[in-house]
Amino acid sequence: ICPVPAQVLAAEYLDEIASCSSFMGTSGCETSCTAPCTHKPDIIVAGHSKGGNLAVYAASFCSSAAQKRIVHVYNFDGPGFDAKVLSRPEYQRICERTTTFVPQSSVVGMLLGHEEPYIVINSEQSGLMQHDLYSWCIERTGFECLEKVTDGSRFVDATLKSWIAGMDYSQREGLVDAA
């Protein structure tokens, strides 16, 4: 079930962006993607929900030249990957530069597998409504963090993982296509 077309396109897009000589008028660089440039700025990749999954996938499977410039990947409540992706060296190389944020009752962000650390954020909503980033609580210096996800989140996560593990490949593919 991996890669899906969106993941392939995300990795290609990241390579295209990384090959550009300039990012929003970087000092000392031309504005054309074909112009020579002595300064290649660092890259930060981020996304929410499916976009978080795409950000992690793209950062993992883009070119090695692009990957070397990635300083961090932020996944905001995006699903993880199956064991095949998690074991790939491309994913492992980017994993230590990846942080996933999930609300305390996360469902989406706990789907499939994650090896990167995750930070639990307090949300003013309940249940699935916590997936909305605008419900996440912030303080002066950043997110209002909690120690762990709720027991309900862990229960739903274990139940979904067990259910998905019992599916054959075509059923999993149908589930991914439906999302």
Map each language-model feature to its residues:
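Short glycine-enriched nucleophile-adjacent loop
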Residues: 55-64
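Alpha/beta hydrolase fold serine-hydrolase catalytic domain that processes acyl esters and thioesters
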Residues: 1-21, 37-42, 63-179
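Ala/Thr-enriched low-complexity intrinsically disordered regions
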Residues: 26, 31-38
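Gly/Ala-rich beta-loop-alpha elbow adjacent to hydrolase catalytic centers
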Residues: 47-51, 55
